[in-house]
Design a protein with these regions (language model features):
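Single conserved hydrophobic/aromatic residue that forms the stacking wall/gate
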Residues: 1-9
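Short Gly/aromatic-enriched secondary-structure transition segments
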Residues: 29-34
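Glycine-rich phosphate- or other oxyanion-binding loops that anchor nucleotides, phosphorylated ligands
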Residues: 37-188
């Protein structure tokens, strides 16, 4: 897959949806968009936005598959990633359809531990964060900024009564609300 992309991608900026079907929809907004690669859950289009080369690559769901995509994209020259997709609101002010711009993440998953000690915080690039906030404002979207909670299980915290560790899940969920986490997701 990487060899397919290396011949065609030299873009610093990559938008990362989870669902491969979202790639074509995002690429419709590019000038000169074309399909570069399609293998398993990884689909890549490249093109231009406002004269800047940009790509979109799907990652599948969760940290392990996202890390595969990002590792290969870094080898192709990418250095700025914008993850787009679905999250669940933790903060009751976050409503369906709102934008959440993550400034950092609680690392409750396993993948990031392969890259940095758990004590090291997962924080977003300030310039990229500010650009996403400015774009949300310009487009009139309701947005929230703050820390998100990243996890490995899609259903665990959303259906805790079904889980053997329901007590722990419920208590942690309340803790994330109290400390101000905005949303829960699986790829940050």
């Amino acid at each position: 897959y990487r060899r397919q992309r290396q011949m065609c991608i030299r873009d610093s900026y990559v938008i990362l949806p989870g669902d491969p079907k979202r790639c074509a929809k995002i690429a419709e907004h590019f000038d000169n968009a074309h399909l570069v690669a399609d293998s398993r859950e990884f689909v890549t289009y490249t093109g231009e936005l406002d004269g800047v080369k940009v790509s979109v690559t799907s990652t599948g769901i969760g940290g392990p598959s996202a890390s595969i995509a990002m590792e290969e994209l870094v080898l192709c020259g990418a250095d700025t990633f914008i993850r787009v997709g679905t999250c669940g609101g933790i903060d009751l002010d976050v409503k369906g359809g709102d934008i959440v711009v993550a400034t950092g993440a609680v690392r409750m998953e396993g993948t990031s531990k392969e890259y940095a000690p758990i004590e090291y915080p997962a924080v977003a690039d300030l310039d990229t964060t500010n650009a996403l906030v400015a774009a949300s404002r310009k487009l009139g979207y309701t947005y929230h900024t703050g820390v998100v909670q990243c996890k490995d299980a899609f259903y665990g915290q959303h259906e805790p009564e079904r889980m053997p560790v329901s007590y722990e899940l419920l208590n942690k969920w309340e803790a994330w609300k109290r400390v101000g986490c905005k949303a829960s997701e699986m790829e940050s």
